[in-house]
Each structure stands twice: as structure tokens, then as C-alpha cells.
UniProtKB/Swiss-Prot annotation:
<keyword id="KW-0460">Magnesium</keyword>
<feature type="binding site">
    <location>
        <position position="356"/>
    </location>
    <ligand>
        <name>(E)-4-coumaroyl-AMP</name>
    </ligand>
</feature>
<dbReference type="GO" id="GO:0016207">
    <property type="term" value="F:4-coumarate-CoA ligase activity"/>
</dbReference>
<feature type="binding site">
    <location>
        <position position="459"/>
    </location>
    <ligand>
        <name>ATP</name>
    </ligand>
</feature>
<feature type="binding site">
    <location>
        <position position="368"/>
    </location>
    <ligand>
        <name>(E)-4-coumaroyl-AMP</name>
    </ligand>
</feature>
<dbReference type="InterPro" id="IPR000873">
    <property type="entry name" value="AMP-dep_synth/lig_dom"/>
</dbReference>
<feature type="binding site">
    <location>
        <position position="284"/>
    </location>
    <ligand>
        <name>CoA</name>
    </ligand>
</feature>
<comment type="pathway">
    <text>Phytoalexin biosynthesis; 3,4',5-trihydroxystilbene biosynthesis; 3,4',5-trihydroxystilbene from trans-4-coumarate: step 1/2.</text>
</comment>
<feature type="binding site">
    <location>
        <position position="333"/>
    </location>
    <ligand>
        <name>(E)-4-coumaroyl-AMP</name>
    </ligand>
</feature>
<feature type="binding site">
    <location>
        <position position="263"/>
    </location>
    <ligand>
        <name>(E)-4-coumaroyl-AMP</name>
    </ligand>
</feature>
<feature type="binding site">
    <location>
        <position position="468"/>
    </location>
    <ligand>
        <name>CoA</name>
    </ligand>
</feature>
<feature type="binding site">
    <location>
        <position position="213"/>
    </location>
    <ligand>
        <name>ATP</name>
    </ligand>
</feature>
<dbReference type="GO" id="GO:0005524">
    <property type="term" value="F:ATP binding"/>
</dbReference>
<feature type="binding site">
    <location>
        <position position="221"/>
    </location>
    <ligand>
        <name>ATP</name>
    </ligand>
</feature>
<feature type="binding site">
    <location>
        <position position="214"/>
    </location>
    <ligand>
        <name>ATP</name>
    </ligand>
</feature>
<feature type="binding site">
    <location>
        <position position="356"/>
    </location>
    <ligand>
        <name>ATP</name>
    </ligand>
</feature>
<dbReference type="Pfam" id="PF00501">
    <property type="entry name" value="AMP-binding"/>
</dbReference>
Amino acid sequence: MITAALHEPQIHKPTDTSVVSDDVLPHSPPTPRIFRSKLPDIDIPNHLPLHTYCFEKLSSVSDKPCLIVGSTGKSYTYGETHLICRRVASGLYKLGIRKGDVIMILLQNSAEFVFSFMGASMIGAVSTTANPFYTSQELYKQLKSSGAKLIITHSQYVDKLKNLGENLTLITTDEPTPENCLPFSTLITDDETNPFQETVDIGGDDAAALPFSSGTTGLPKGVVLTHKSLITSVAQQVDGDNPNLYLKSNDVILCVLPLFHIYSLNSVLLNSLRSGATVLLMHKFEIGALLDLIQRHRVTIAALVPPLVIALAKNPTVNSYDLSSVRFVLSGAAPLGKELQDSLRRRLPQAILGQGYGMTEAGPVLSMSLGFAKEPIPTKSGSCGTVVRNAELKVVHLETRLSLGYNQPGEICIRGQQIMKEYLNDPEATSATIDEEGWLHTGDIGYVDEDDEIFIVDRLKEVIKFKGFQVPPAELESLLINHHSIADAAVVPQNDEVAGEVPVAFVVRSNGNDITEEDVKEYVAKQVVFYKRLHKVFFVASIPKSPSGKILRKDLKAKLC
């Protein structure tokens, strides 16, 4: 899951599916209840190649800043960015990369990441993006699974790539160039004003990106995203007369989330390129540097994950900076509780704060707050908005698989041209995720309220089963994070001979606070039903999370063994 939001129980109380009434389970199969966006569908030019679509407005923004490297201040206009991307395309082609070939981009956020991804698109190559902090073993698995022929990386990661393949081409973006590697300048030495004249027939169903799922609930699998699926997803967000996410060409969009993750790649980079906005690249998070960049470059859009939202809401350093330029704060990857949202709103009263929901396989965005629309519609606290345009969403019963109506929690399913084509070389996993009618089953539990707003309760596989009762960890985590003495928290199941599983919490204390285990237990017990009460609390220095901000529950469960 890339983006998610947690419902606020005091605002909405969905029907408990443990008791199913006759109107939920009729004697004859009902017509499926399908939910759609409150915004009208739009025409989407998803017959185009991705790069053509993203740079379609090039002539009108050619002299505008496209990329700004936060650490150096170096800026590239749209005209310069497009030209370098074409030179990279030419360089890759000269190195033997052809349509359908896979290249691996192993970089932190940088201009070279953008040049490489878009350059690969121009020749019909496929980019598989990888986490630079992966181990050699993890990189080998992704390299082998994807079949990548070339890796573009930074010299500091080269040692991890030794012995991964004799015929593997390594290109590094910095100087000096390590032994047996080619400098990035090799790709951009084509000094023609109109480089790469080859004609490549790229269809909408051809693969453009090959991200790998996080593996927190299973083995990583290559997710085939086509030119059509990526264009559809971007258009669902930023195209049309009243876009769901209203970006303007004078917007400056903070890119601190890693581009190797689909959330940042899609909702930050591709959305920005399509809109003619400026992308401010930050290669790693550090609160002081982030605040300085927001102030110095007058950032207007900040796409974040909850840990960064917590920093903005709770870190006293924030008060020393002028953040008045920010108009949208997008949050995803995990829930935001109401108190945390209120804290951030006090810090950024002029900004609209909203959440979205998605997953890599869905292209990735399923829903988004309509508060970000050109003609905004207020969204409830805890909601992750309505389903995106040109898509269909339904909620199915966890056992009967029948379609459910309003306020009835079940598994979220999505259908539309934005979803993945398949899992790479894994037809069994593909058919288990996308059914014969084209519905992608997310594995997320949620419901749609009477205003068509979506509330995610939890991951299906992460639900704790206490004597048959379902205990959603995200609900308890939201309560914990809203406590003034708690900086971060995660809840996981611990095996129990009597109950089967019991919820236990890992808690990070706020600076200077000495909250005890009993304090935490009592705080939660006052707010939840008996079977959701915490049985143990462990205090830790930090909560392990993936680059996208998802809690690595398997690491915490391992501590309980």
C-alpha cells in the first residue's frame, strides 16, 4: 500500500461484518455496488508514450525551471531537461539498449534519476527502480527477476554490485568513475541539438516501469506498469477542467520522498512534469534542511508520509521558518489521526491537508482528497477522499465476496486502465490479484460512507485476531501517535495460547517524556473495546519503516520470538 488513511470511529461507525443481515446477504446475487468519483470522467490520451504525454506542454514551459537540486541549487529548465533526456535516450541506444529491455535505476533523488527514467521511456526501455540501501542479496534478486541489462547508480553503491553479472553495464553519475564502470557523461555526449532520431513504435500496453512490491507481506514481485497505466493514473489526478489535484505551472513541489518508490515517482515527478511545475529534489530527509528548502524556494506542494508530518507538527524548529508558501500537504502510506492533523493545521493554517490511498499494483493512486481539486470539496477527517476519475471501486465481503453498500467494511477492489498489467513472469500471483472481471483485489479493508468517501481500516493480512475478533493495528496506532508523550508507535500481534493473538505495541517516547507501560495501556483502554486493549508495551528508539513510510511489521514481530 502506498497511501492510506484511517477512519475516525467517533465520526463514522461502519456496520460490523461479523453479523451479516439479510440485506447484506440476499438469497439471489445482487447487482454489485460500484462507487465512482464525484468528479466527471475525462478524456485521457493514454495512446501516447509516457514521455510524450509528460512533455506535451513543453513549448509553453520551455524556459521555466523543471528541476532544482536542493543540495546545490543547480536548476534545469524544461527545455534543458527534455534535451538531456533525449541525449540519455541516444546514449542508451548506442550502448545496445532496445525497446523492452530493462535498465535498473539505483539512485537517491537526483536530476540523473529523472534523465534516466524519461530517457529510457523515449526508446521504449523499461526502468526498474531499486532502493540504494538494499543489500547485495536484495539487489541480486531484483536484478535477476527483472532481467536488467544496465544499472545507473552512484559510485558509493558499486561495491554492492560486484559479481552480479559479467555482461552487466554499470554507469555512475559522480566522479571519479570507479573501475569497470562508465561515467554518466557517456550517455549525454551526444551534443546534437536534436539527438536520438530513431523511430521506436511504443504502444500503450508496452511496459514503462517495473517497480517491485515492498515484500512486507510476501516476496517482492515485479509490477508491470505500462505507458497506458501510468498516463491514466497521472491524468486521473491532474488533467481536466477540474483536476482532482490542482497543480499550476508556478507551483514548486517538494520531492523528499524517494523516487524509486511509486508514490513519489508518480504523484510527485510525473504529475509535476505533466503540469509544468517545478520539482525541488531532496536526496535525503533532514528536518533543518527540509525547512530551509521550503522557505528558500517557496515550496507550494509537499507530498509527505506520516513520519514527516509528525516532524512538521511536533518539532519546535518549525517555528523558526516561514512556511506560508505551502498550499497543499499530501500525506500517504499510513494513517493520520485527527489530533495530528489538527497539530499540523495549527502550524500551517493556510495549507490544505489531505490524504490519499493507493498501492503499487493499482498504478498507484486509488483515491485522493477532493480538497485538492480546482473546485475543492471538503473532506472528512480520516478520509482518503473519493475514488479517482475514470475508475470503479467496490467493497466486497471478506468471506462471501459479495459486493457491499455504504458503511460496510470489506476488501477494497479497483478497476480501470491505471492498474498494473501483471506481475512479471508470475501468472499465478497475477490471477490471484486481478480477477476475470478485471477487478484488482487490494488486500486492504475499508468502507465507503454515504458521501462516497473512502476510509481504510487496515491491511487484510495485518489484522490481529483476538478470540475471533478483528483488531486493526492502524486504529490503535492512530490513538497512540496522538498522545503528546508518544512520538511514534506500531502495533503487532503476539501469539497467545488462549486468545490466539493479542495486540502489543512498540512505542517511541517524545523527547524528555517518561511515560510508562501502564500509562500507555490505560490511555488506550479508555478508548477501545476490551478486545482491542494492549497486552504489552515495548519502548524503542525508532519504528522500522520502508522508504515509503510503511511500518515493517515483520521486523517487529521478529523481536517477539
